Protein backbone atom coordinates (compact mmCIF):
# COMPACT_ATOMS: atom_id res chain seq x y z
CA UNK A 1 0.00 0.00 0.00
CA UNK A 2 2.82 2.41 0.83
CA UNK A 3 4.50 1.75 -2.52
CA UNK A 4 1.21 2.33 -4.35
CA UNK A 5 0.68 5.59 -2.44
CA UNK A 6 4.18 6.82 -3.34
CA UNK A 7 3.55 5.99 -6.98
CA UNK A 8 0.38 8.07 -6.94
CA UNK A 9 2.22 10.94 -5.27
CA UNK A 10 5.05 10.74 -7.80
CA UNK A 11 2.53 10.94 -10.62
CA UNK A 12 1.29 14.21 -9.15
CA UNK A 13 4.73 15.82 -9.10
CA UNK A 14 5.05 18.32 -11.98
CA UNK A 15 7.60 17.11 -14.52
CA UNK A 16 7.82 20.38 -16.47
CA UNK A 17 8.16 23.55 -14.39
CA UNK A 18 8.71 27.13 -15.48
CA UNK A 19 9.91 29.71 -12.94
CA UNK A 20 9.29 33.31 -13.96
CA UNK A 21 11.12 34.52 -10.86
CA UNK A 22 14.67 33.78 -9.73
CA UNK A 23 14.34 32.49 -6.17
CA UNK A 24 12.33 29.38 -7.02
CA UNK A 25 14.82 28.49 -9.75
CA UNK A 26 17.66 28.63 -7.22
CA UNK A 27 15.61 26.61 -4.74
CA UNK A 28 14.90 23.85 -7.27
CA UNK A 29 18.60 23.67 -8.16
CA UNK A 30 19.57 23.49 -4.48
CA UNK A 31 17.17 20.57 -4.07
CA UNK A 32 18.75 18.78 -7.04
CA UNK A 33 15.55 18.78 -9.12
CA UNK A 34 16.65 21.08 -11.94
CA UNK A 35 15.75 18.37 -14.47
CA UNK A 36 12.14 19.49 -13.99
CA UNK A 37 12.90 23.08 -15.02
CA UNK A 38 12.14 23.92 -18.65
CA UNK A 39 11.99 27.72 -18.46
CA UNK A 40 13.33 30.54 -16.30
CA UNK A 41 13.50 34.32 -15.89
CA UNK A 42 16.10 36.30 -17.82
CA UNK A 43 17.11 37.90 -14.52
CA UNK A 44 18.26 34.55 -13.12
CA UNK A 45 21.86 34.71 -11.88
CA UNK A 46 21.91 31.87 -9.34
CA UNK A 47 23.16 29.38 -10.20
CA UNK A 48 25.11 30.84 -13.13
CA UNK A 49 24.71 27.66 -15.14
CA UNK A 50 20.90 27.97 -15.19
CA UNK A 51 20.77 30.40 -18.12
CA UNK A 52 23.00 28.10 -20.15
CA UNK A 53 20.80 25.10 -19.46
CA UNK A 54 17.26 26.49 -19.50
CA UNK A 55 15.02 28.44 -21.85
CA UNK A 56 14.56 32.10 -20.91
CA UNK A 57 10.85 32.95 -21.06
CA UNK A 58 10.39 36.10 -18.97
CA UNK A 59 11.68 39.20 -17.28
CA UNK A 60 10.14 40.18 -13.96
CA UNK A 61 7.29 42.29 -15.32
CA UNK A 62 6.78 40.61 -18.67
CA UNK A 63 6.75 37.12 -20.15
CA UNK A 64 6.66 35.46 -23.55
CA UNK A 65 3.22 33.91 -23.14
CA UNK A 66 3.30 32.07 -26.46
CA UNK A 67 6.70 30.54 -25.74
CA UNK A 68 5.50 29.37 -22.32
CA UNK A 69 2.42 27.76 -23.88
CA UNK A 70 4.58 26.05 -26.53
CA UNK A 71 6.73 24.51 -23.78
CA UNK A 72 3.57 22.94 -22.26
CA UNK A 73 4.51 23.30 -18.58
CA UNK A 74 2.72 21.37 -15.85
CA UNK A 75 3.26 24.36 -13.57
CA UNK A 76 4.43 27.98 -13.75
CA UNK A 77 5.74 29.57 -10.53
CA UNK A 78 5.87 33.33 -10.01
CA UNK A 79 6.12 35.89 -7.24
CA UNK A 80 3.76 38.49 -5.80
CA UNK A 81 0.93 40.65 -7.03
CA UNK A 82 3.48 42.39 -9.28
CA UNK A 83 3.34 39.35 -11.59
CA UNK A 84 -0.44 39.04 -11.40
CA UNK A 85 -0.96 40.23 -14.98
CA UNK A 86 1.36 37.49 -16.28
CA UNK A 87 -0.46 34.93 -14.14
CA UNK A 88 -3.84 36.11 -15.40
CA UNK A 89 -2.81 35.74 -19.05
CA UNK A 90 -1.47 32.24 -18.45
CA UNK A 91 -4.51 31.12 -16.47
CA UNK A 92 -6.78 32.30 -19.30
CA UNK A 93 -4.74 30.07 -21.60
CA UNK A 94 -5.32 27.09 -19.30
CA UNK A 95 -1.88 27.05 -17.67
CA UNK A 96 -1.60 26.08 -13.99
CA UNK A 97 0.08 28.91 -12.08
CA UNK A 98 1.38 29.19 -8.52
CA UNK A 99 2.10 32.69 -7.21
CA UNK A 100 4.03 33.02 -3.96
CA UNK A 101 3.26 36.23 -2.09
CA UNK A 102 5.38 36.87 1.00
CA UNK A 103 7.83 39.51 2.26
CA UNK A 104 9.49 37.95 5.31
CA UNK A 105 12.20 35.47 6.28
CA UNK A 106 9.52 33.07 7.53
CA UNK A 107 7.81 33.42 4.15
CA UNK A 108 11.06 32.49 2.41
CA UNK A 109 11.34 29.35 4.54
CA UNK A 110 7.73 28.43 3.70
CA UNK A 111 8.47 28.92 0.00
CA UNK A 112 11.49 26.61 0.19
CA UNK A 113 9.41 23.94 1.93
CA UNK A 114 6.46 24.30 -0.45
CA UNK A 115 8.71 24.05 -3.50
CA UNK A 116 10.36 21.01 -1.92
CA UNK A 117 6.97 19.35 -1.52
CA UNK A 118 6.06 20.19 -5.12
CA UNK A 119 9.14 18.42 -6.48
CA UNK A 120 9.02 15.48 -4.06
CA UNK A 121 11.88 16.68 -1.87
CA UNK A 122 10.07 17.29 1.42
CA UNK A 123 12.90 16.02 3.63
CA UNK A 124 15.63 17.70 1.60
CA UNK A 125 13.83 21.03 1.89
CA UNK A 126 13.52 20.57 5.66
CA UNK A 127 17.25 19.82 5.87
CA UNK A 128 18.06 22.94 3.85
CA UNK A 129 15.83 25.09 6.06
CA UNK A 130 17.34 23.68 9.26
CA UNK A 131 20.86 24.25 7.96
CA UNK A 132 20.08 27.91 7.24
CA UNK A 133 18.27 28.40 10.57
CA UNK A 134 21.24 26.98 12.48
CA UNK A 135 23.52 29.48 10.75
CA UNK A 136 21.11 32.27 11.67
CA UNK A 137 21.19 31.19 15.31
CA UNK A 138 24.99 31.35 15.33
CA UNK A 139 24.98 34.85 13.85
CA UNK A 140 22.24 36.09 16.19
CA UNK A 141 24.08 34.66 19.19
CA UNK A 142 27.29 36.37 18.14
CA UNK A 143 25.72 39.80 17.61
CA UNK A 144 23.61 39.59 20.78
CA UNK A 145 26.84 40.05 22.77
CA UNK A 146 27.60 43.42 21.21
CA UNK A 147 27.52 46.44 23.54
CA UNK A 148 26.11 48.67 20.81
CA UNK A 149 24.15 48.01 17.64
CA UNK A 150 24.71 50.06 14.48
CA UNK A 151 21.92 52.22 13.10
CA UNK A 152 21.45 51.10 9.51
CA UNK A 153 19.92 52.71 6.44
CA UNK A 154 19.19 50.28 3.61
CA UNK A 155 18.54 51.95 0.25
CA UNK A 156 16.65 49.87 -2.30
CA UNK A 157 16.57 52.64 -4.91
CA UNK A 158 18.21 56.04 -5.27
CA UNK A 159 15.68 58.25 -7.06
CA UNK A 160 13.31 58.39 -5.36
CA UNK A 161 15.04 57.05 -2.27
CA UNK A 162 13.36 53.82 -1.13
CA UNK A 163 14.06 52.03 2.15
CA UNK A 164 14.34 48.27 2.67
CA UNK A 165 11.58 45.69 2.39
CA UNK A 166 10.60 43.46 5.32
CA UNK A 167 12.96 40.52 4.81
CA UNK A 168 15.89 42.97 4.49
CA UNK A 169 14.84 44.73 7.69
CA UNK A 170 14.62 41.35 9.44
CA UNK A 171 18.09 40.42 8.19
CA UNK A 172 19.46 43.71 9.54
CA UNK A 173 17.98 42.88 12.95
CA UNK A 174 19.18 39.26 12.82
CA UNK A 175 22.73 40.41 12.07
CA UNK A 176 22.85 42.84 14.99
CA UNK A 177 21.73 46.14 13.48
CA UNK A 178 18.80 48.51 13.88
CA UNK A 179 16.89 49.41 10.71
CA UNK A 180 16.27 53.18 10.96
CA UNK A 181 13.15 52.86 8.80
CA UNK A 182 11.72 49.69 10.30
CA UNK A 183 8.27 51.28 10.34
CA UNK A 184 8.28 51.35 6.52
CA UNK A 185 9.53 47.79 6.05
CA UNK A 186 6.07 46.28 6.45
CA UNK A 187 4.98 48.01 3.22
CA UNK A 188 5.20 45.48 0.39
CA UNK A 189 5.16 48.03 -2.44
CA UNK A 190 8.24 50.16 -3.09
CA UNK A 191 6.14 53.30 -3.62
CA UNK A 192 5.02 53.06 -0.01
CA UNK A 193 8.62 53.02 1.23
CA UNK A 194 9.74 56.29 -0.35
CA UNK A 195 11.65 58.47 2.11
CA UNK A 196 13.35 61.88 1.94
CA UNK A 197 17.02 62.83 2.24
CA UNK A 198 16.15 64.87 5.31
CA UNK A 199 14.66 61.77 6.95
CA UNK A 200 18.01 59.99 6.57
CA UNK A 201 19.99 63.01 7.81
CA UNK A 202 17.82 63.27 10.93
CA UNK A 203 18.20 59.56 11.75
CA UNK A 204 21.98 59.77 11.16
CA UNK A 205 22.79 56.10 10.39
CA UNK A 206 26.13 54.52 11.28
CA UNK A 207 26.01 52.33 8.19
CA UNK A 208 24.46 52.72 4.73
CA UNK A 209 23.84 49.62 2.62
CA UNK A 210 22.65 50.21 -0.94
CA UNK A 211 21.25 47.78 -3.49
CA UNK A 212 19.66 49.54 -6.43
CA UNK A 213 17.62 46.75 -8.04
CA UNK A 214 20.25 45.72 -10.57
CA UNK A 215 21.74 49.18 -11.11
CA UNK A 216 25.35 49.84 -10.06
CA UNK A 217 25.54 51.74 -6.77
CA UNK A 218 27.52 54.99 -7.05
CA UNK A 219 28.98 55.66 -3.61
CA UNK A 220 30.39 59.07 -4.59
CA UNK A 221 26.92 60.14 -5.68
CA UNK A 222 25.56 59.17 -2.27
CA UNK A 223 28.33 61.10 -0.50
CA UNK A 224 27.58 64.26 -2.50
CA UNK A 225 23.88 64.42 -1.60
CA UNK A 226 22.98 67.72 -0.03
CA UNK A 227 23.56 67.62 3.72
CA UNK A 228 24.73 64.01 3.78
CA UNK A 229 28.27 64.99 4.72
CA UNK A 230 26.90 65.27 8.28
CA UNK A 231 25.84 61.62 8.39
CA UNK A 232 28.10 59.29 10.39
CA UNK A 233 28.07 56.61 7.69
CA UNK A 234 29.30 59.12 5.11
CA UNK A 235 31.92 60.68 7.40
CA UNK A 236 33.29 57.25 8.35
CA UNK A 237 33.13 55.76 4.85
CA UNK A 238 30.56 53.17 5.91
CA UNK A 239 28.71 52.99 2.59
CA UNK A 240 28.40 49.44 1.25
CA UNK A 241 26.89 47.83 -1.82
CA UNK A 242 25.29 44.39 -1.91
CA UNK A 243 24.20 43.12 -5.31
CA UNK A 244 20.45 42.97 -5.73
CA UNK A 245 20.45 39.35 -6.91
CA UNK A 246 21.70 38.48 -3.44
CA UNK A 247 19.80 40.68 -0.99
CA UNK A 248 16.67 41.63 -2.96
CA UNK A 249 15.89 38.09 -4.05
CA UNK A 250 13.23 36.71 -1.67
CA UNK A 251 14.80 33.29 -1.55
CA UNK A 252 17.89 31.33 -0.54
CA UNK A 253 20.33 34.03 -1.69
CA UNK A 254 19.15 36.69 0.74
CA UNK A 255 18.97 34.43 3.80
CA UNK A 256 22.36 32.80 3.15
CA UNK A 257 24.86 35.02 1.32
CA UNK A 258 22.88 38.17 2.11
CA UNK A 259 22.90 37.42 5.83
CA UNK A 260 26.61 36.61 5.81
CA UNK A 261 27.54 39.80 3.94
CA UNK A 262 25.50 42.05 6.21
CA UNK A 263 26.81 40.35 9.34
CA UNK A 264 30.37 40.85 8.06
CA UNK A 265 29.71 44.57 7.48
CA UNK A 266 28.30 44.96 10.99
CA UNK A 267 31.08 42.91 12.59
CA UNK A 268 33.75 45.05 10.95
CA UNK A 269 31.96 48.23 12.05
CA UNK A 270 31.78 46.92 15.61
CA UNK A 271 35.49 46.08 15.68
CA UNK A 272 36.44 49.52 14.36
CA UNK A 273 34.13 51.55 16.56
CA UNK A 274 33.41 49.63 19.76
CA UNK A 275 36.14 47.10 20.42
CA UNK A 276 39.20 48.84 21.86
Question: Which residues does each PLM region occupy?
Answer:
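N-terminal ligand-binding lobe of clamshell/alpha-beta domains
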Residues: 3, 8-276
